[in-house]
A protein has these predicted regions:
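Left-handed beta-helix
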Residues: 160-537
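Domain-scale recognition of functional cores that engage charged ligands
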Residues: 1-284
Length: 537
């Protein structure tokens, strides 16, 4: 969290990036919710609950490892079994200056920094992560970094895992368009002539060594902003036995030295500022050891026969990192503000697909001067596929400056109009349900004059209407007009029906059928997921 300037309010100590508040929760909680969304999807399709085993690599820099464990403890392990997590920590490596001399901190200790995520594989082997997965029967895994909150959007992770599993691949990476001149690496196919044939592998190349590898970073189209080389993200699919074999050939892949300016102390205790560097390594480069050998040369579509693969998706659905604090310079790349703008654009695409009338997102400049044209937040388990959400949300309007916040998975909204702000919150995401049809909410909504931090979801309201579902609460409203702010709480196990007669609201409370809900999920003959209404509601 260095570049994010994350500081503990009480101790004034630096905090890890995983605790950055984004969309009203930490980045770590957002990642866990993405995992739970896929588990919920599996449950709805197969009728069986599963728990995904998660290994987390931390760092001892600035007590990050301890703080991550404390976060899990405070969060009650996010409602998951403690034994479904495995923590291991990457080592710190010494820093040198351009003269090759050691750099020190003010206390005369060596200046140490994490040595890069390429140590992931060797550490996983040494600290028992692979053995832990093997005992649990896990052969394949997805890898992602906590500072990329859009990675779980729509179908990206499911497609990556689906291709890897269905075609028994050993390595895969999620690629997307890459801005010319950006500090992002790329991946190319490396061909080697072997005795009796040709071998192929994916070769990631970091941006700082493009010239050494003959990579000319130019736009795909004349005058375009995107490079002809895609971005090689840290969203990976891996075959664990294949990774273990690859470690024997390259235990620390992608080693490089990338100098950066910083303040340090020399061996005589003198404070200096200059270019310093550490030996880094990159986890994607393990793919260079995943070679596929063929008797003839591969070209075009035949390259899909390789054991490694890339998926290619929209950038705003693949990578939008929260690496640094926004400096007010209009450069949003790798900032929380930039990631939030991508989240809004994804939300606009989603709501448009739902045939919901919604204002277009404002330009970044207008957004930060005047606020958003709309806000839409939702729980990952609502989908996560846009094609699923579009079957739950149908039609309706989200008027200018309005907000809809859906912290719920089992919901049906049909022709719902919102002028103001509405929160629909299920305290138990797996049990709470709601069904609204031809409903209208009108209230004062967001206070746009307040110092709102939208990307943190720190928003002040003039009025807001909230529907809170306790446990297995079920809320139903049809042909109802909700005027002004307010809060409705539906008790656990109850079904609350809102009705309107002659302009007056009244409510009917009854016991909820424990088997009731909104949706039944099935696969169609064309491998699409189709939702049908349950008979009991």
């Amino acid at each position: 969290g260095d570049r994010l300037s994350l500081i503990d309010d009480e101790t004034k100590e630096p905090l890890p990036a995983a605790v950055l508040p984004f969309l009203g929760k930490t980045l770590l909680q957002g990642l866990i919710e993405d995992v739970q969304a896929r588990e919920y999807l599996y449950f709805k399709l197969r009728g069986r609950k599963i728990i995904t085993n998660i290994a987390i690599m931390t760092s001892h820099e600035k007590q990050n490892h301890r703080r991550i464990l404390e976060l899990f403890e405070r969060a009650g392990w996010f409602g998951r079994p403690k034994e479904s997590f495995f923590f291991f920590s990457q080592p710190l490596v010494p820093v040198i200056n351009t003269e090759g001399k050691w750099c020190f901190e003010e206390n005369e200790r060596l200046f140490l920094k994490p040595g890069g995520h390429g140590v992931l594989w060797k550490l996983a082997q040494q600290q028992g992560v692979f053995d832990w997965f093997q005992k649990k029967g896990v052969q394949k895994a997805l890898v992602r970094q906590v500072n990329n909150p859009v990675a779980g959007c729509d179908y990206g992770l499911l497609a990556l895992a689906g291709i890897g599993l269905s075609r028994n691949k050993t390595f895969g990476s999620a690629a997307c368009p890459r801005l010319v001149g950006s500090q992002e690496g790329t991946s190319v196919v490396r061909e080697r002539i072997r005795k009796g044939g040709f071998s192929y592998s994916l070769a990631p190349i970091e941006y700082c060594v493009f010239k050494e590898h003959g990579v000319i970073d130019e736009s795909e189209e004349e005058g375009g902003v995107y490079s002809k080389y895609p971005s090689n993200t840290n969203i990976l699919f891996v075959d664990l036995p294949a990774i273990r074999r690859a470690i024997n050939k390259s235990p620390i892949p992608g080693m490089l030295v990338n100098p950066k300016r910083a303040v340090y102390f020399d061996g005589d205790g003198q404070k200096r500022e200059g270019r310093i560097a550490r030996l880094e390594c990159t986890m994607q480069n393990i793919s260079e050891q995943m070679e596929s050998t063929f008797s003839g040369r591969l070209e075009g579509s035949s390259l899909t026969e390789m054991s490694s693969f890339l998926t290619y998706n929209q950038r705003r659905k693949t990578i939008s990192c929260t690496k640094r604090k926004y400096g007010g310079d209009g450069l949003f790349l790798e900032t929380p503000e930039g990631a939030f703008l991508d989240v809004l654009n994804n939300a606009y695409e989603l709501l448009t697909r739902c045939n919901c009338k919604v204002p277009k997102p404002r330009s970044p400049k207008l957004f930060f001067e005047r606020g958003p044209s709309f806000l839409f937040f939702y729980l990952s388990a609502l989908g996560p596929l846009f094609s699923i959400i579009a079957q739950k949300l149908k039609g309706g309007k989200l008027l200018w400056g309005s907000e809809l916040d859906l912290h719920i998975a089992d919901v049906e909204l049909e022709n719902v109009t919102i002028k103001g702000s509405v929160l629909l919150h299920a305290e138990d995401e797996n049990k709470g349900a709601a069904q609204l049809s031809n409903a209208m909410f009108v209230n004062e909504g967001i206070d746009f004059r307040a110092p709102n931090l939208y990307w943190k979801k720190e928003i002040q309201y003039k009025e807001r209407f909230e529907i809170i579902l306790e446990g297995a609460g079920f809320f139903v409203a049809e042909d109802v007009h909700f005027r002004g702010g307010g809060r409705i709480i539906v008790p656990d196990g109850m079904r609350l029906i809102a009705q309107e007669k002659r302009g007056e609201l009244f409510f009917i409370k009854e016991k909820r059928d424990p088997f009731s809900g909104n949706w039944h999920y099935t696969f169609t003959d064309h491998a699409k997921i189709e939702l049908s209404k349950l008979t009991k509601s």
